[in-house]
């Protein structure tokens, strides 16, 4: 039921919005950061890639989160990346796991920020 990001990127890019939020951490979508290598981000637009997944109880290590952020930043520019989550965490995960994932996101973003800026 999930479509490949490459199949819908053109529609994405036609939207007149300030940013794009999309899954990028789940096993189904983790490889799709490469789509941005072949498509320019519209001027003045940012991306909100999911760098922690709602599809597993495993808490991502901050280094993995940082690596995911850096992958996107190297393609679209660090000023155009705002780290996010894959969908909402509350409906599928225990609250303690959701908070741990958010803490990992913060720590990973700090690492990526130090390395990129």
Where do the PLM segments sit?
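Domain-level signal for soluble alpha/beta catalytic cores
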Residues: 1-117
């Amino acid at each position: 039921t999930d479509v490949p990001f490459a199949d819908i990127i053109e529609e994405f890019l036609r939207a007149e919005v300030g940013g794009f939020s999309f899954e990028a951490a789940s096993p189904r979508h983790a490889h799709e950061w490469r789509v941005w290598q072949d498509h320019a981000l519209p001027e003045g637009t940012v991306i909100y890639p999911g760098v922690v997944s709602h599809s597993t109880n495993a808490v991502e290590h901050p280094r993995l989160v940082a690596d995911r952020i850096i992958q996107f930043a190297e393609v679209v520019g660090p000023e155009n990346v705002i780290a996010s989550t894959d969908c909402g965490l509350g409906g599928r995960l225990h609250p303690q796991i959701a908070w741990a994932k958010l803490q990992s996101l913060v720590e990973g973003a700090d690492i990526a920020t130090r390395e990129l800026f």
